[in-house]
Amino acid sequence: MNAVRRAQAAVAALAVTATAGCAGAGAIGGSENTLVVAIVANPQMQDAIELSERFEEENPDIDLDFVTLPENESRAKITASVATGGGEFDVVMISNFETPQWADNGWLVDLQPYIDQTEGYDAEDFIPSIREALSHEGDMYSVPFYGESSFLVYREDLFQQAGLTMPEQPTWQEIRDLAAELHDPENGMTGICLRGLPGWGENLAPMNTVVNTFGGQWFDEEWNARLDSEEFREATKFYVDMVQDYGIPGAAAAGYGECITRYSQGQAAMWYDATAMVSTVESPQDSVVVGKNGYAPAPVVETDASGWLYSWSLAIPESSDKADDAWKFISWVTDKDYIELVGNELGWERVPPGSRQSTYELPEYQEIAEAYAQPTLDSLSTASQEQTMVEPVPYPGIQFVGIPEFQDLGTRVSQQISAAIAGQISVDEALEQAQRYAESVGESYQEEQ
């Protein structure tokens, strides 16, 4: 089965989810001058909507129509639209998971000619690991709105009060022990926040980094499914147990959005998640813990590092007939000038992090980001399979498996993990079913060897 057919089959599996995800998205479409922009409803994207009037003032012949959806719904809807040539979106927010696959399938406009012709855009300024992750055969097919790895944020003030010290490079067992010390639910404080919400980009993102550093893998180099291995089982049980013992109430339904709210409102002592969290955690408008936080590398077990690599990026579907105007918006919202606009208008803690190297050279950003700028860059620089995995694997990706089937496979497995967190099934039962899902996918690749 070639790549396009694999992708089309994967999209078919997502069709029901995508249809359900349309509800609440709002009417799609507009005049001939309207660009329809599909984005994920995360804080940095909401800032872009707030500032988009500036773009429309500079480009009076272009109107912007934003379609925002929660992460899981957004992934399914955008995937179904782009893969089938639906044509309802002119700009889509995707990631380094979709970009190389969709570029290879011919579903995205090659942005390199636009980049090369746009004076002052400076794509060489993008953080190298992010730029490479969004490229196919040397050309960029999406450009980063923000980039991220993962690290641990913790309340320095609570640690000091309890006489605790965060190790320079913590292990997961050390984090569990610290969570146990700080867990005080009777006073509204949980030891740690970890995602439990189903979704291959929700609970599986942090959990897969735990699996990796424990020595687990989804498939070995012969495409044998390995979700029933001792390493995968040990990592999953560790993650589920910690969420159940020291996580937030209702963790099985808590994703990035719930954790960022919980931590920012002073209700969690630690949180392991995306480095992009800093835009909210350190924002005086959104957080009550500004200036009280320390940042540590992603916890490890058997590896030197374990942070993921991810970028929310913007691309133009081949089905759009407004590529030139779409690039005008994309280049505006991912340019150095936009970074400064956010800083000056909304606050420097709100700038999209992890995309451009020059952001970390701005004096205003350096001043407010002293605690987390270097940890962010360090996490991005160590986010590779070589440094975060024990065993070699036949697929790209750290917190995801970079194959078309993973959107469906990951979603199914994530539902099993969430059910285990909720106490509906055991970890063994969850992984027994997950292994069957993975075996079906692995067998299709074995047939091609």
Regions found by a protein language model. Give the residues of each.
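C-terminal lobe and pocket-closing loops
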Residues: 116, 276-289, 302-411, 447-449
